[in-house]
Amino acid sequence: MAMPNLGDMMKQIQQAGEKMQDVQKQLEKIVAHGEAGGGMVKVSVSGKQKLLSLTIDPDIMDDAEMVQDLVLAAVNNALDESARLAQEEISKVTGGMMNPADILKNLNLGQ
């Protein structure tokens, strides 16, 4: 049984590191959107799972409980979309050689 070539292993590790840097750059470019209540609450989040914007229809501001529920729903919708887009981007960058869920966890972005 042949031993793995150390030079080849080091090259693969370097390539994986470069791909991770590419993934980080691509995640910064992703913007996902979510909404709830038929568009009464809209949010945008980055591919790094950061809230970028929140818009609330002023007509619903009198009902605090409804606003809270709609904000939570819209944020969760946007985060789900962001995770889906991030996994797609990771698959593109890595050519499917690395598990997108594992990469997201390594970047502290996975569930």
Curated annotation (Swiss-Prot):
UniProt xrefs under InterPro entries: YbaB-like_sf, YbaB/EbfC
Q: Which residues form a coiled coil?
A: none
Family designation = Belongs to the YbaB/EbfC family.
State how it assembles: Homodimer.
What keywords are annotated for this sequence in UniProt?
Cytoplasm, DNA-binding
Which function does this protein serve?
Answer: Binds to DNA and alters its conformation. May be involved in regulation of gene expression, nucleoid organization and DNA protection.
User: What is the superkingdom listed in this entry's lineage?
Assistant: Bacteria
Biological source species: Pelodictyon phaeoclathratiforme (strain DSM 5477 / BU-1)
Principal location class: cytoplasm
UniProt GO MF annotations: DNA binding
Protein name, entry field: Nucleoid-associated protein Ppha_1174
List locations, semicolon-separated: Cytoplasm, Nucleoid
